[in-house]
Amino acid sequence: MNSEKEDEPLEEIGDSNNVLDLTSYQLHSLDTVELPPNLIELDLTANRLSGLDSRIAQLSTLKKLSLRQNLIDDSAVEPLSHWDALSDLEELVLRDNKLAKVPDVSIFTKLLVYDISFNEITSLEGISKASSTLKELYVSKNEVNKIMEIEHLHNLQILELGSNRLRVMENLENFTKLEELWLGRNRIKVVNLCGLKCIKKISLQSNRLTSMKGFEECVALEELYLSHNGISKMEGLSALVNLRVLDVSNNKLTSVDDIQNLTKLEDLWLNDNQIESLEAITEAVTGSKEKLTTIYLENNPCAKSSDYVAAVRQIFPNVEQIDSNLFA
């Protein structure tokens, strides 16, 4: 089905003279589009482009370029590496295309955001050419099997490598500014965070973890997502006093442990485990009893009784959600 936008006059598109948004115009090329020379942002998301218009090479003021959700392959993106006029580019989005390798972005010496997620990339080889100015790197939903060539990216704040084929957490030592690490849907068995003390959000959902050990030094951690693993014991959490969200659903837990000190905990996901006792949960969450607003416990033995929801509401006076039940 064609987008209604196809019928709109292209010369009227855009928010201003320096922002051009051509999202979802089903364009096969930019032949009918005027590209103002002073563009700062060019958004070509959700079109049918299989190549790059050579006029983009002259946009010397461009800061943001999005080619998300097109048909760009390795040969089509190659000219970018020679377009020196674009050296001030700060954000490059190549998400959801047909890339098989990491493009050469070495000329973008001020790059802050780089997104190559949802492609067919098998290796991070070539990422070493990316500028050390980079703050956000997104490589999710590819086929990468090793964390490599990223040690120089010491300004990284967000690293997204979810839905790949990673087995080992490695080469993270230099990321002293990293705040978010997303590694869900990989094949990781052991947590190795190399003492990332500034990190605030970690996702290791849907991996092969059997232990929670490895987070002890991440004292700034606020959100921890560990669902769909094989964890049988809650441990190594007592020092994580800033934790607000803890998701350990869909594991092999029989009890709730090591969270008594977590006075800031607001969201606790324990559903789909083997937890027997509500009384034990009461004792385990003493520190956050007043703070907790959301708790998931369904599909545990302790959630089978008919008065289970009422009992949980008594334990947590300020709770707003129990499983799918919302309370005003």
Swiss-Prot record:
Keywords: Leucine-rich repeat, Protein phosphatase inhibitor, Repeat. Signal peptide: none annotated. GO terms for biological process: abscisic acid-activated signaling pathway; protein localization to nucleus. The keyword Zinc-finger does not apply. LRR repeats lie at residues 13-36, 37-59, 61-82, 86-110, 111-130, 131-153, 154-177, 179-196, 197-221, 223-240, 241-264, 266-287, 289-312. The keyword Cytoplasm does not apply. PROSITE patterns: LRR. It comes from the Eukaryota. One of its GO terms (cellular component) is cytoplasm. Disulfide bonds: none annotated. It holds the Pfam family LRR_4. One of its GO terms (molecular function) is protein phosphatase inhibitor activity. Inhibitor of protein-phosphatase 1 (PP1). Binds to and inhibits PP1 activity. Interacts with human protein phosphatase PPP1C. This is Protein phosphatase 1 regulatory inhibitor subunit PPP1R7 homolog. It comes from Arabidopsis thaliana (Mouse-ear cress). The lineage of its organism: Eukaryota, Viridiplantae, Streptophyta, Embryophyta, Tracheophyta.
